[in-house]
């Protein structure tokens, strides 16, 4: 097994999606369908095709078997019977059964806003009552793939009609609620079947983007020159009696969840650098002694992303250890990082493993037959069973949703620690770049992320234990797979918001860490050179030099430990601490060494020296502060993988370091009439969120993963192995 299976799977799916988008179409043959292909159809206008002669032959053979069975004495469900708990009825004319099935299923709620038709408005409706078009497109593609396996007795003509709907951008408007995913997703699929029938009361979206319009299915078929389809024996049931809606939306969910979880792993690296973490907890030995594959994979990814960082310490085998002379945190406090960082591999690892299993379950479902009864092409027999029960999808998406909550909890804990100056190893309160009494920068983000995590935790509760008996107690157990998938997609949206907020805060924290660390580095150097001139006459230079090393460290600690003070007060406190240690090293450490020299100053001389040092610090800090805000140097000090995510934020999106109150937008700071000017923090976080939603951030993560040597995961290697078990008819 690969040592990085989730990352390699994600890179493989990412490459596969790019490949399909450039190709523009996907051949459906009943097996080999992956979640990337579903996403390509749903989100990127990639059209499914069915042109394989063997597939067409399977469809023809399946319908011939059904026709022969109908002519015989065998009782076939849905052909000679009613449906569900009413299957004890025996209709005299089975030709109307398909229409009767559509009538009983097309019962979902849609409001006039969904349909763009005249009627009283419903301003109290907060959310649309219809499925997103992308879900419906994905559902159609998945149902086609399930049907072309040849077990549902669907005609080739019917499949071609479904394909034409997608190709001509006719997307049925499907109610969001009403499926219990027991006998498949009956209600959603019935609206797709109703579109094929040309129902004047089923509505569709024709076209995409600004050119899209809402018309009836009857009008839409007329516009593309397609006749309404008269469903053949059992075809109505064959179209609706499956798990396609659950499987399709679960495919989108697992793809997004895998990417968000990997992004959260990379984001933990940024937080570690912002917090100047002591990352010995990433040593391979720790994972080797507890060999859960997910834990080892997380640690390996993080080690690779942090390689070369001058903001963290403790990476094993550092070839550039001599570079780690930058003082990035106080040398007091906890000797180990708190659990949100130190145990992140142990926390994220099980989520990696669950996502791999969920992906496997969903991929199998995409390439399975879900219907009843089934046609056996080898024997010609009809088999009655329950392959429509979508519990495998429920199992998958509930694992995904639980994993999302766990990832969110980790990010929430990391973020609130990073923003809190009493826990973040020397960064200012709320990650404010100016005086903490004037600016509260990321405090609102802390509140937002708590809100997102609360909702995410609520959504993570199991759906499957809320099953209600339905349909004359015939469907007494039902999977609720589509319902669970809907809530999983909501959870993905929330975690995406959290990732966006934490990424914004982490970039700010890294900037501040570098700004203060480089200030101390340059200032203590100049201070050491200037100290002889600041001291009263009569002190030997040798004595001063012996005291300086300890005093400088005392100065650095005082600076980090007083991050909650405004700059003027911080400089004053730091100057006092420096002079105190210079005069008496025991003020800094109790185990005073013989070589430590105590400089004997009078009280007046001490006050004068403190004032001189304070003035030196104040001038140096304000000069350094202004220069850094003008041109941050953060990228020179961070790990290669972290740098990719940092630069994506700072350069690709153009989101600058927050300078404090000066960056709050107001009419006065518009550069020119009509310009946007400065942005709120929320606007910047929204830009990041949009980049997460449209895949740009993960694309950068994928590139960075390869740049740091984490494997290619190419479509010709990993993908073939990942799906080897499923690529059989």
UniProtKB/Swiss-Prot annotation:
It comes from the Eukaryota. There is a cross-link at residues 182-184 (5-imidazolinone (Ala-Gly)). Its main location: cytoplasm. Coiled coil: none annotated. Its EC number is 4.3.1.24. Pathway: Secondary metabolite biosynthesis; Phenylpropanoid metabolism; trans-cinnamate biosynthesis; trans-cinnamate from L-phenylalanine: step 1/1. Signal peptide: none annotated. The active site is at residue 77. The modification 2,3-didehydroalanine (Ser) is found at residue 183. GO terms for cellular component: cytoplasm. It is found in: Cytoplasm. Contains an active site 4-methylidene-imidazol-5-one (MIO), which is formed autocatalytically by cyclization and dehydration of residues Ala-Ser-Gly. (E)-cinnamate binds at residues 241, 336, 342, 372, 443, 471, 474. Keywords: Cytoplasm, Lyase, Phenylalanine catabolism, Phenylpropanoid metabolism. Phenylalanine ammonia-lyase; part of the gene cluster that mediates the biosynthesis of squalestatin S1 (SQS1, also known as zaragozic acid A), a heavily oxidized fungal polyketide that offers potent cholesterol lowering activity by targeting squalene synthase (SS). SQS1 is composed of a 2,8-dioxobicyclic[3.2.1]octane-3,4,5-tricarboxyclic acid core that is connected to two lipophilic polyketide arms. This is Phenylalanine ammonia-lyase. It comes from Phoma sp. (strain ATCC 20986 / MF5453).
């Amino acid at each position: 097994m690969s040592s990085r299976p989730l990352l390699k799977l994600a890179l493989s799916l990412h490459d596969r999606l790019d490949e399909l988008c450039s190709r523009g179409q996907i051949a459906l043959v009943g097996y080999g369908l992956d979640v990337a292909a579903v996403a390509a159809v749903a989100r990127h206008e990639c059209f499914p095709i069915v042109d394989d002669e063997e597939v067409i032959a399977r469809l023809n053979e399946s319908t011939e078997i059904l026709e022969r069975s109908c002519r015989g004495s065998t009782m076939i469900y849905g052909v000679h019977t009613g449906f569900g708990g009413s299957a004890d009825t025996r209709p005299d004319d089975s030709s109307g059964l398909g229409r009767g099935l559509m009538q009983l299923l097309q019962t979902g709620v849609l409001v006039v806003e969904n349909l763009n038709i005249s009627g009283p408005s419903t301003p109290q409706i907060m959310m649309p009552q219809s499925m997103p078009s992308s879900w419906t497109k994905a559902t159609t593609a998945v149902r086609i793939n399930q049907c072309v396996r040849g077990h549902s007795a669907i005609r080739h003509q019917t499949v071609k009609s479904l394909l034409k709907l997608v190709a001509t951008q006719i997307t049925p408007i499907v109610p969001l609620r009403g499926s219990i995913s027991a006998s498949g997703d009956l209600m959603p699929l019935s609206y797709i079947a109703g579109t094929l029938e040309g129902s004047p009361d089923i509505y569709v979206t024709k076209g995409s983007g600004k050119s899209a319009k809402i018309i009836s299915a009857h009008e839409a078929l007329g516009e593309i020159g397609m006749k309404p389809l008269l469903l053949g024996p059992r075809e109505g049931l064959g179209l609706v009696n499956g798990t396609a809606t659950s499987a399709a939306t679960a495919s989108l969910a697992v793809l997004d969840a895998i990417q968000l979880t990997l992004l959260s792993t990379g984001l933990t690296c940024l937080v570690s650098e912002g917090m100047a973490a002591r990352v010995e907890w990433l040593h391979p030995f720790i994972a080797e002694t507890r060999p859960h594959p997910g834990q080892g994979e997380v640690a390996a990814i993080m080690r690779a992303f942090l390689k070369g960082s001058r903001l963290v310490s403790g990476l094993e085998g550092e070839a550039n250890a001599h570079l780690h002379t930058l003082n990035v945190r106080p040398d007091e406090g906890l000797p180990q990082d708190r659990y949100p960082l130190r145990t992140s591999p142990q926390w994220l690892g099980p989520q990696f493993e669950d996502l791999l299993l969920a992906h496997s379950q969903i991929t199998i479902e995409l390439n399975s037959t879900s219907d009843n009864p089934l046609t056996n092409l080898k024997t010609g027999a009809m088999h009655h069973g329950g392959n429509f029960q979508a519990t495998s999808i429920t199992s998958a998406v509930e694992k995904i949703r639980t994993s999302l909550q766990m990832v969110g909890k980790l990010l929430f804990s990391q973020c609130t620690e990073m923003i809190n100056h009493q826990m973040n190893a020397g960064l200012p309160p709320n990650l404010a770049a100016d005086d903490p009494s004037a600016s509260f920068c990321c405090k609102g983000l802390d509140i937002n992320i708590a809100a997102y995590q609360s909702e995410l935790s609520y959504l993570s509760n199991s759906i499957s234990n809320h099953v209600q008996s339905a349909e004359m107690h015939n469907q007494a157990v039902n999977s609720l797979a589509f319902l669970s998938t809907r809530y999983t997609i909501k959870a993905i949206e929330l975690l995406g918001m959290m990732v966006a907020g934490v990424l914004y805060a982490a970039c700010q924290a890294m900037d501040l860490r570098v700004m203060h660390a480089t200030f101390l580095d340059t200032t203590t150097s100049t201070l050491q050179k200037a100290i002889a001139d600041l001291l009263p006459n009569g002190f030997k230079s040798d004595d001063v030099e012996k005291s300086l090393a300890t005093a400088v460290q005392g100065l650095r600690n005082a600076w980090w430990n007083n991050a909650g003070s405004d700059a003027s007060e911080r400089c004053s406190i730091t100057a006092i601490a420096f002079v105190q240690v210079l005069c008496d090293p025991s003020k800094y450490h109790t185990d005073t060494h013989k070589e430590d020299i105590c400089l004997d100053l009078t009280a007046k001389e001490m006050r004068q020296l403190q004032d001189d040092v304070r003035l030196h610090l104040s001038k140096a800090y304000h000069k350094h502060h202004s220069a850094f805000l003008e041109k941050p140097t953060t990228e020179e000090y961070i790990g290669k993988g972290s740098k990719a995510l940092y630069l994506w934020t700072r350069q690709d999106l153009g989101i600058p370091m927050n300078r404090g109150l000066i960056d709050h937008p107001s009419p006065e700071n518009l550069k020119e009439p009509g310009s946007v000017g400065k942005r709120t923090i929320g606007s910047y976080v929204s830009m990041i969120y949009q980049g997460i939603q449209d895949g740009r951030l993960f694309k950068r993560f994928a590139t960075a993963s390869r740049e740091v040597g984490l494997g290619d995961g190419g479509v010709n290697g990993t993908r073939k192995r990942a799906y080897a078990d499923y690529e059989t008819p």
